[in-house]
Amino acid sequence: TDVGFDGWR
């Protein structure tokens, strides 16, 4: 739902 640093969340 939101890419922080790896591409997840």
Swiss-Prot record:
Domain of life: Eukaryota
Catalytic activity field: Endohydrolysis of (1->4)-alpha-D-glucosidic linkages in polysaccharides containing three or more (1->4)-alpha-linked D-glucose units
EC number: 3.2.1.1
Reported cofactor(s): Ca(2+)
GO molecular function: alpha-amylase activity; metal ion binding
Keywords noted in UniProt: Calcium, Carbohydrate metabolism, Glycosidase, Hydrolase, Metal-binding
Cofactor note: Binds 3 Ca(2+) ions per subunit.
Disulphide bonds in the chain: none
Enzyme class: hydrolase
Subunit text: Monomer.
Family of this protein: Belongs to the glycosyl hydrolase 13 family.
Entry protein name: Alpha-amylase 4
Native organism: Capsicum chinense
